[in-house]
Amino acid sequence: MNLIAQLEAEQIAELGKDIPDFKAGDTIRVGYKVTEGTRSRVQNYEGVCIARKGGDGIAASFTVRKISFGEGVERVFPLHSTNIDSIEVVRRGKVRRAKLYYLRARRGKSARIAEQTNYKPKSN
């Protein structure tokens, strides 16, 4: 393992976050810490993961898309952010692409993603 990868692995271990195994096409619920004045609360953001970038490194991120009041809303989250309280996989999607940007142009039934029924988690 080279020096940079070793430093990144140490930083990720230091954060001590339990990140579930998810990929593009999965419906996920992200608990994001929001600070309003002096109060802090957790706001849930649920939608379809349309992309993951950066692998599992410290700078990795993922994009979640949802439809809110008839408008498509996308949000990019850093995977190892301290503001992320929790990531929960709601539903596994069956897709053949790593990036689902084509969903931006689709509405209604054509934007549906089939559910994956035979999911096997990665063994470490």
From Swiss-Prot:
Keyword entries, A-Z: Ribonucleoprotein, Ribosomal protein
Gene Ontology CC terms: cytosolic large ribosomal subunit
InterPro entries: Ribosomal_bL19 (IPR001857), Ribosomal_bL19_CS (IPR018257), Ribosomal_bL19_sf (IPR038657), Translation_prot_SH3-like_sf (IPR008991)
Keyword flag Ribosomal protein: yes
GO biological process, one term: translation
Any one GO molecular-function label of the UniProt entry: structural constituent of ribosome
Highest taxon in the source lineage: Bacteria
Gene3D superfamilies: 2.30.30.790
Transmembrane segments annotated in the record for this chain: none
Family, per entry: Belongs to the bacterial ribosomal protein bL19 family.
Record's function text: This protein is located at the 30S-50S ribosomal subunit interface and may play a role in the structure and function of the aminoacyl-tRNA binding site.
NCBIfam families on file: rplS_bact
PANTHER family reported for this sequence: LARGE RIBOSOMAL SUBUNIT PROTEIN BL19M (PTHR15680:SF9), RIBOSOMAL PROTEIN L19 (PTHR15680)
Designated name of the protein: Large ribosomal subunit protein bL19
Originating organism: Dinoroseobacter shibae (strain DSM 16493 / NCIMB 14021 / DFL 12)
